[in-house]
């Protein structure tokens, strides 16, 4: 024990003498994992998001560019409904619908995705109303339609043939009008940014109906609308189970609607997160990830050296898992560190102020989250006593 205490002292004044950062050696920073969340609040062990470059006016670096103004991008990414070359044409760097030639389909199949497209109602359609002006649509997976149409309507009292609300621009066609009409006049470019999540099925039944969110010219117009059926005219058509990836389509409704700057980003289903979500977590998956994290953290601990670093390390391990081996290591490390702290002079205690306060906070996180009891480790009482003494001397 004497040699161990001497080793602790050496480590304290060498490796641990520098001031800790906000996290420093203290792994326990926020409330602990639970049955539906494999990670703690503010968990530094949680995987860090991949960096995506977002140059101004250009697609993000992880986007699949479907049309960039070139014939090459058409040849590589688009076909007709039968898989043959699309009859839509490139004109002045725009992807233009050839009326009555049929839909343009992506060659690749996509499921849940973020989709960006810019489109324009031809100027000659400015005085057309109802479903007659610049009619097209974005059709995610070839099943659901976000309407494209000349729907600019600055004068609600004008005596014109009005359209049905669930068929104007940015409507989920035949289901839901946009929250507001964010349309621009014919001849002015418009943008759609669509976030699409497909329905989830199990054993032939819909578990979750799927949602679509639409920003029209930067304005939120569809707020996670739950899909009620397929995109059809005049009749209700219930949701139908389909493949999880299918080509997306641009509609040919007989108007030469031009498009530009089309890109798509594949995104995970919100139901794919089975390890950290109140909505979709599976307890067995959460448990497995917590055990994996605990094992990786435990491998970094030297159970023979009861210093602040290893004590805080084992406390963090316990926040993920309370395997017998981890509990035994915690008892041993805490007892050794407790003995070492009690051997310190007042000057040495003051030199370890940061580690005393930080380790005490770690214990309190575990106690607050009912991972351990308040009296399970005598070390906590020692830390609390020393911390009070140090605060009195301030």
Where are these regions (language model features)?
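Bacterial N-terminal signal peptides that target proteins for export
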Residues: 1-6
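Carbohydrate-interacting regions of secretory-pathway proteins
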Residues: 19-394
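N-terminal signal peptide c-region/cleavage motif recognized by signal peptidases
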Residues: 14-15
């Amino acid at each position: 024990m004497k040699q161990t205490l001497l080793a602790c002292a050496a480590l304290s004044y060498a490796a641990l003498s520098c001031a800790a950062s906000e996290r420093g050696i203290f792994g326990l920073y926020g409330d602990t994992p639970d049955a539906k969340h494999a990670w703690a609040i503010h968990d530094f062990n949680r995987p860090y998001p991949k960096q995506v470059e977002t140059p101004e006016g250009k697609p993000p670096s992880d986007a699949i560019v479907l049309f960039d103004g070139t014939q090459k991008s058409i040849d590589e990414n688009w076909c007709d409904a039968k898989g043959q070359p699309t009859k839509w044409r490139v004109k002045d760097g725009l992807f233009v619908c050839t009326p009555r030639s049929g839909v343009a389909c992506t060659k690749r199949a996509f499921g849940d995705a973020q989709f960006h497209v810019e489109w324009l109602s031809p100027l000659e359609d400015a005085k057309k109303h109802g479903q007659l002006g610049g009619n097209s649509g974005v059709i995610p997976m070839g099943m659901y339609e976000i309407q494209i149409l000349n729907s600019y309507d600055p004068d609600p009292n004008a005596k014109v043939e009005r359209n049905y609300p669930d068929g104007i621009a940015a409507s989920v066609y035949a289901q839901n009008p946009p929250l507001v009409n964010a349309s621009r006049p014919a001849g002015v470019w418009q943008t759609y940014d669509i976030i699409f999540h497909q329905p989830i099925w199990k054993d032939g039944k819909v578990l979750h109906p799927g949602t679509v969110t639409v920003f029209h010219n930067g304005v939120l117009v569809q707020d996670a609308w739950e899909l009620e059926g397929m995109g059809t005219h005049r009749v209700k058509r219930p949701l139908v189970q389909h493949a999880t990836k299918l080509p997306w389509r641009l509609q040919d409704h007989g108007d030469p609607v031009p498009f530009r700057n089309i890109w798509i980003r594949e995104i995970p289903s919100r139901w794919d997160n089975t390890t950290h979500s109140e909505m979709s977590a599976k307890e067995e998956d959460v448990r497995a990830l917590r055990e994996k994290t605990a094992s990786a953290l435990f491998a970094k601990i030297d159970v023979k050296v009861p210093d602040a670093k290893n004590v805080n390390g084992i406390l963090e391990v316990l926040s993920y898992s309370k395997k017998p081996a981890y509990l035994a290591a915690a008892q041993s490390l805490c007892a050794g560190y407790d003995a070492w702290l009690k051997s310190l002079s007042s000057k040495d205690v003051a030199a370890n102020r940061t580690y005393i306060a930080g380790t005490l906070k770690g214990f309190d996180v575990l106690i607050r989250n009912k991972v351990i009891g308040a009296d399970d480790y005598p070390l906590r009482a020692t830390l609390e006593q020393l911390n009070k003494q140090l605060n009195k001397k301030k």
